[in-house]
Amino acid sequence: MNQARDPAVVELRDVRLNFEEKEVLEGVSLRVETLDRLVIMGQSGSGKSTILRLILGILPPTSGGVFFKQFEISRLRRRKLQHIRTQMGMVYQYSALLSSRTVRDNVALPLEELTDKTRAEIDQAVDQKLEMVGMLDVKEQMPSELSGGMRKRISLARALVMEPELILFDEPSAGLDPVISSVIDELIISLTEQSKVTSVIVTHEMDSAFRIGTRMAMLYQGKIIEQGTPEEMKRSENPVVAQFLSGSTEGPILEGSQDAIATK
């Protein structure tokens, strides 16, 4: 007798999404297991960030299901969805810190808005997370006084402050130079492992993708055309994947060929 699988932390089942007459996602299926760091890679505008919005429940799928553990996101009532979102952290492409608030206040905001913790408990949690990302000494400064890499660290502290089960990263290397990008990648790895957090990372930066990911999925023309471990992706015989990873100008991506798509 087959034993039922435990619910994945995140699962997309044959998800389709239309914007007006355009089909953005075409039958996307993904499964993110506990403690995975799943990297979704693909060209700019391919729908990678749209998948994060589906997981957060900001967008409902046209058809198919998006699940967080046993819960189908699009079927949840508003209060239940708000509760589920407290179990998710989000690191935005350009950090999305409030310019009128100090670093400490930015990190404290989710706890102030979504919990009944005391001021002392909030301050303790904020200090702990800022110390984890090496930013405790700038907690009284404003975001405008900090570098892009520092703001990214603070965004990560804010994402961790609710002790989530899942963190979503939208282009974590955006706007960073290669050295700082590597530092942020290593910080993401160490903190997600230390905090035992599952994560989904959207990026088109291949160096970051292969540093961070335990599993990878390639999104192309609205479909997942390949998924596997980083080593499996490197060995892929799919010409779209091979071209994307190599950065070659020769191949089906620029030609717009449909022949290379072989959805798994």
Indicate where each model-derived feature is located.
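Catalytic Walker B motif of ABC-type/P-loop ATPase nucleotide-binding domains
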Residues: 167-170
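Helix-to-loop junction immediately C-terminal to a conserved catalytic motif
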Residues: 56
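A short, proline-enriched helix->beta-strand linker immediately N-terminal to the Walker B motif
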Residues: 161-165
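Conserved ABC ATPase "signature" region
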Residues: 71-72, 119-137
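Conserved ABC transporter NBD signature motif
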Residues: 64-72
